[in-house]
Amino acid sequence: VRELLRLYKKGYSIALMIDQRVSEGIKSKFFNEDAFTTTIPAQFIKKFNCKVVPIYIERYNDINFNIKIEKPIEFSKGTSTEKITRDLNIWLEKTILKKPGEWIWSHNRWK
């Protein structure tokens, strides 16, 4: 996190994978189950009032992929960590449900 913070303060864009199981975070609903979810995006939003630009990869044939970049999701600094985290999980659920066969998890998110 320190490295992300250092780079962000220098004006770099940073990326986080929010679909990973974490040992620290908060429990937030993910496909109707409680799952520990990172609060790092919420912390950056609340501290720096930054935008979240959702990005994901989608297969378009057997060997090629497209990188999909969506419109920024904006939150106010006053939005709670819980709401930001839940809203990002909702976005992730919707994205997964578009093409569930393309989502790869090598871990149990709900453990």
Give, region by region, the residue ranges found by the protein language model.
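Non-catalytic C-terminal accessory region of glycerolipid acyltransferases
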Residues: 2-111
